[in-house]
Structure formats: structure tokens, C-alpha cells
Amino acid sequence: MKLSFSLPSKSKPKVTATTADGNNAVDDGTSKEFVTEFDPSKTLANSIPKYVIPPIENTWRPHKKMKNLDLPLQSGNAGSGLEFEPEVPLPGTEKPDNISYGLNLRQKVKDDSIGGDAVEERKVSMGEQLMLQSLRRDLMSLADDPTLEDFESVPVDGFGAALMAGYGWKPGKGIGKNAKEDVEIKEYKKWTAKEGLGFDPDRSKVVDVKAKVKESVKLDKKGVGINGGDVFFVGKEVRIIAGRDVGLKGKIVEKPGSDFFVIKISGSEEEVKVGVNEVADLGSKEEEKCLKKLKDLQLNDREKDKKTSGRGRGAERGSRSEVRASEKQDRGQTRERKVKPSWLRSHIKVRIVSKDWKGGRLYLKKGKVVDVVGPTTCDITMDETQELVQGVDQELLETALPRRGGPVLVLSGKHKGVYGNLVEKDLDKETGVVRDLDNHKMLDVRLDQVAEYMGDMDDIEY
């Protein structure tokens, strides 16, 4: 069986390029534009063509769109009514005489001229004909393969716009059935530096701008008086309301810049450098707030001292650790003198408890012992300012404790020199539990006997 069919050639949709004037133009890469005149009152027309790809017609199941047409009524014998016609037997269809009426069983007549293979071939040919018809319909609706000319006629960057323009879309017009305006594409920018999850760059910019404006307004208010003059001038008495020297009073001796002052502390020859926002006039509201805050802190400290039997841990350590040693003099008389054992060690954290030392600016400040220069004297590096303070006596200090689980060193008592972790601490009873890292034993100690250790185990001197 031979099968052959032919497909008619279809015309490809041509891509039209329209210029700004509406005229078609072909962008073949070698287009020329001739200038005939120069008119300064007119702007140059956009010579870049706008490509438009015509839409492809929807040919899916075209038979569904077809409608059955009503046949016109025949008017030949419309008025004559029904008529009977005698049946004329066709040749070869005469009824035999021996036919019997009633239920009869038909017998198959074997026709030698028509075989079974011919019937089967006839059935197969009908199925093949249906498939061929379906194949022809698919091939008729199949688009042609694109050629190189199709790719060269429209640039890649303008293909989407040209395709949408064929359906009536214009730049700035929304896409969709009920679109009112064009939706801008959301751009995702890569986060950098410390920008993590939940970071909002727009909000951070607003906060930074507000902070800068607030700081500038604050500086302007600090540096300018009511009459336009300078509020803080050299020789004026001021109060320090912020920073490490909070609460001290002094005189401005120098203004190295617009943001800093050099103040000489009253009652001493010490000079400190503070910011513009860290000083206030004597008798101002800022000074009153600062003094009230310091007073509240002192009251809280007094209540804490009363709760611990009226003595701090540093004073209690000194009173409990005092031993009396008797010595005989040449006259044969004996006298008692107090000998205070040293508990200072390097790499431990301490707190300054003296209000009079250094004008009180280091009161309740924490630091690290960097060197023990004498039995009861050491050098300390302050935590906040990294300032090195030399020649500090242990009477001005008390030990600082870490949080639960922090490293500690036992400084005195029967467990002196033990390095471990602080498991529990009771501030009311001034007791704690330390776990020794060597044998993992639990040791009961007083809190004034231990301090936070900030060094290595190799630095411990047993």
C-alpha cells in the first residue's frame, strides 16, 4: 500500500518595523538617514524602529467553531400530501417462494469471491484513513521551522516587546484583563556587611538621617546661646553629666575643636577631655537630673550595704582576714599589730570601691589586674576606657564575680589556688559553690575568697 500527500506552502508572518512617524522601516544594519535641513525649533525624531510581531491565529479544533446550517424545505409536493409508491424489486433481490413466515434463522452465505483477508484489509484501511486525516490536519496547523532570517529580523532584547505589541500592548500599559497600570518589577539587591534577615535598607536610611539631624540640632543648641553667642567659653564653670567623669565639676581651659572641651577638675590639677554633649551649666535641668541620678545610685548602694550587715564584701574581707601577730620589742614589752595578707593575683577582675580615690571618677568601675608590683599593690587596666591605673592598693578594691558557670580562682582560705567554675552563688549569705577542674569536686567557699579569672591555667601560680 502506497501513501502520498502534499502540503501547501504557508506564508510566514512578516515582522514589521515601524518608526516613530509610523512608516515601516527595515533595520538591516546598513540603513542610511539623509539630513536635508536643520531646524532648531524641532526635535529629532526617533529613528529606531519599533518591531511588531503579528499574533498567530488560534487554530486549535476549528470544527468546534462550525455551526450546522438549516437546509431549506423542499416545495415540490408540499401541497399534495403523502403518497404511496409501489415497491419495485431490484434485480437479484427477488424473494424466494419457499420463504416461511415467523422466526427464521439466517444462514451465512459463503462467497468465494470475497475472502476474509479482504474484509480485514478494508477495516484496516478505514482506520488508517482516519489517522491520515488527523495527521493532515495537524500538519496544516503546524508552524514552519524558524530560519536565520527570522532571528535576524528582530533583535533578542526587543523580542518580548514586539510580541506583546502584536496583541495591542504599549509601553506603560498593564498586562491582564483588569490591569489599570503597569506593575514595576521588584529588584532584589544583595545584602552586604551586617545586613541580615529582616534588614530594611530604607528604614535604616531614615533612622540614620533622623539621628544625624537630631545630633546636629543638639550640637547647635549646645554651642549657641540665646543672643547668638557661645554658651561654653574658656574659663566657665560646668558640670560633667556623662562619660567616665560624670558628676565632677570643673572649668573649661581649652577648646581644641567644636566637639570637645578640655576641663580642669575642681580641687585637683587633673585635666580631662569631654564632648560637647557631656557638659551642662551649673544650675541647669541637665545638672539636676544628673545629680539626682547619682544620688539614687548612692541610696541603692547604702541599702545594699545595710542588707549585707552594713559592710561591703571588700571591708568584710579585710576585717575577717586580719590576723594578729605579737612580737617582742627590746624593752620586753609586747604589742599587737595587724598584718593583712595579700590576695592579689594577675589576670583577675576587681572593682574599685573607693569614692575618694581619683576624685571618685573610677568608683564602682571594673578592671583587670595586669601586674602585682607589691604585696598589696597592683596595676589595673579599666574595662571601659582601657586606661592603665598604676599603684592601686588592695584596700581600694574588691573581687568581681562572673556569671554562673564562669571561670574563677580561689584567692584565700584552705582552697587557695584552686581554679574552677562558679556553680552557685548566694548573695544574701555571701557563699558560693566552686567546681574544681582538676578533680571535679564541689567546694564551698565565701564569695570574698574568689574572683573572676581572665587568664590561662598555665599562668596560675600555685
Swiss-Prot record:
It comes from the Eukaryota. Residues 1-10 have a biased composition (Low complexity). Residues 156-202 form the G-patch domain. Keywords: Nucleus, Plant defense, Repeat. One of its GO terms (molecular function) is RNA binding. Residues 301-336 have a biased composition (Basic and acidic residues). InterPro entries: G_patch_dom (IPR000467), GPKOW_KOW2 (IPR041994), KOW (IPR005824), Spp2-like (IPR045166), Spp2/MOS2_G-patch (IPR026822). It is found in: Nucleus. One of its GO terms (biological process) is mRNA splicing, via spliceosome. This is Protein MOS2. It comes from Arabidopsis thaliana. The lineage of its organism: Eukaryota, Viridiplantae, Streptophyta, Embryophyta, Tracheophyta.
